[in-house]
């Protein structure tokens, strides 16, 4: 572990390796490079102090260096204990950006690192949060509520909550009043993923959101690309790296058919698996059926399928009774944000055999075993390297534009959750067309008038479903 200066990474000696991969990734991330070209001189993020909690990968390194190029000061940690790419973290730390991220870090370290990305050397405060899953935002808001006298730390419902609450109490004791001051310094948060967005909307509905938020996840150029096409490539990559299993002919069950589920089903189907889908939403279920997938109850296929993937963003999707009934050596994994989609805690009293990092064999009393990937956390990042650079460029360009929007327009946004305007969504798409050799047809003035748009766009209404 390398801990000198203002960073904690696995091995700072990996920085050169990380830098080489960052250089390659930059050629696949035209949106972020275009942001540097457009905003690099004016530096609209000058004065921004961004706390970032997002998977510390090579692609994220390109995002971080884009934010810095636009004038921001940045402190960073990963939003998942298994998703860090240690050479990426080393390269960013070596560049002078404080990073706290190690692949396979403990939950205790995870929350310590989340605290550290708010601790500036001069004692100042972060004024922006760039979040993935909402943990950094939740950390500050829970602490501030505790300082206000609310009883929010006395009843943890999981091991992770117990560890989180202990870290908040530690900071409360060390720095009384700090959480409230940090909360009040935040100008806005930009949130990357469905799970974190749901948290923000819940806060907003209860009147508990103390600063504006931009829902990056629901930008079309994020959810319809990162969630779908990213998962389409990275899910099978993770399963193969973890197990070396042949997927052709296997029966795979995808729990959920939202954008992530659609990409996951396509990923497995493309590898030759026979895919079945479970759903609670009648619209998504109908989509799955008309896409050619059998829509089933998990209970009806749990003893016959070979691979189970949860994609829902909900909890207790694959339960202990499901796993107990699975065939010997069934593969169980999750590509939703948190590990509680699978009841991993209920497996802890069984026999675990670690096969290799993030691959565990778990044996039930009757002798059947399951292969659990990444302890139920994101397997595409835990067992592989996540989505490809190109699709992450679209997501991270949205993040960059959202950070600029909130930081440069104080007072224009209320304490609510917003999405980026359509013209910026279309801008993100345009920035990625050239890399693929795409040529856009242009509307004539008469054609544009006929459908009620301008020749330059936006071309669709805000409620259009792509």
Curated annotation (Swiss-Prot):
NAD(+) binds at residues 193-195, 227, 256-261, 279, 314, 335-337, 380. Substrate binds at residues 57, 132, 192, 222, 226. GO terms for molecular function: adenosylhomocysteinase activity. Pathway: Amino-acid biosynthesis; L-homocysteine biosynthesis; L-homocysteine from S-adenosyl-L-homocysteine: step 1/1. PROSITE patterns: ADOHCYASE_1 (PS00738), ADOHCYASE_2 (PS00739). Its cofactor is NAD(+). GO terms for biological process: L-homocysteine biosynthetic process; one-carbon metabolic process; S-adenosylmethionine cycle. Transmembrane segments: none annotated. It is an enzyme of class 3 (hydrolase). SUPFAM superfamilies: Formate/glycerate dehydrogenase catalytic domain-like, NAD(P)-binding Rossmann-fold domains. Its main location: cytoplasm. Signal peptide: none annotated. Its EC number is 3.13.2.1. The keyword Metal-binding does not apply. Binds 1 NAD(+) per subunit. CDD domains: SAHH. It is found in: Cytoplasm. One of its GO terms (cellular component) is cytosol. It catalyses: S-adenosyl-L-homocysteine + H2O = L-homocysteine + adenosine. Keywords: Cytoplasm, Hydrolase, NAD, One-carbon metabolism. May play a key role in the regulation of the intracellular concentration of adenosylhomocysteine. Belongs to the adenosylhomocysteinase family. HAMAP family: AdoHcyase. NCBIfam families: ahcY, PRK05476.2-3. This is Adenosylhomocysteinase. The gene is ahcY.
